[in-house]
Amino acid sequence: MFSEIIRKLPNTDISISVNDKNLFVIECEGSLYKLATMNPSEFPELPQISIENSIQIEQNNLKDMIRKTIFAVSTEENRPIFTGCLFEITNNKLNLVAVDGFRLAWKSKYLQTKVNDFKAVIPGRTLNEINKILVDSFEPIKIGVAKNQALFELENCKIVTRLLDGEFLNYSSVIPETWETRIRVNKSNLQNCFERISLISSSSMEKEKKYPVKISVDIGKVTISCTNQTGDAKEEMF
C-alpha cells in the first residue's frame, strides 16, 4: 500500500512522520494518509553473511545481462532450480544462464579483476526486483556469495537473497558446437516480424494458450508463420 500511495502522489515534496498514536503519516500538498504501523522490533534484522566469493561489475552491464536471460527463467515450481538464473564464474568470465525446458538463454561478460571460480543460482524473482533498481551507468554493484545466501550491494542499498538448491543444467553440453544452417538477418526487421506474429501466437482471446511460431529458411528468404484457432499470419524477410 505504501509504495502505491507514493507512486500516485504528485511529483513534489512529501512529508513523512509518525504521530503520537503511532500512525505513519504521509502528507503531500492536499493529500493526507495515515497508516497503521507495527512494532519495529518485530522486523527481522539484516542477516550477517560470511562472504566466500565476490565480484564487482558495472550496473549497466549486469542490467543488460539480466535483461537478456531473465525471460527464460522457468515459472514451474515443480522444478525449483530452474526458477532461478545461474551465476557462474569460469576463467574470470561471468556467465548468466536461464532455462525453462523450452528455451536456454546465456550471456557472458569478462570481468576486469581476477576472481575465483564459483557458481550460484539466484531466484528469478530476486533478479527481477534488482533489475528495477539498477541504473544505466558505470557505477559498480558488488555481488557476494555465501553458502546459501547472496548479497547484492549498491550505494546505500543492500539486497540479501537465498540461493536455490539443486543441480543446474550442464548448459554447455546442450549448446551445439557446429551448425547445419547459419543465417544473417537484419535484427530490427526480425524483431518487428516477431512482434507482429506475437499477436497471433499470444492471442488475447486465449490468454493461457501459446501457439508455436514456425521459421522456414530458403535461399534468400526467411518465412515466419503462426496459426491459431481464429486465424493465421505469415511474415517474409528477403
For the regions a language model picked out, list residue spans one by one.
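Structural preference for solvent-exposed beta-strand-turn elements
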Residues: 1-238
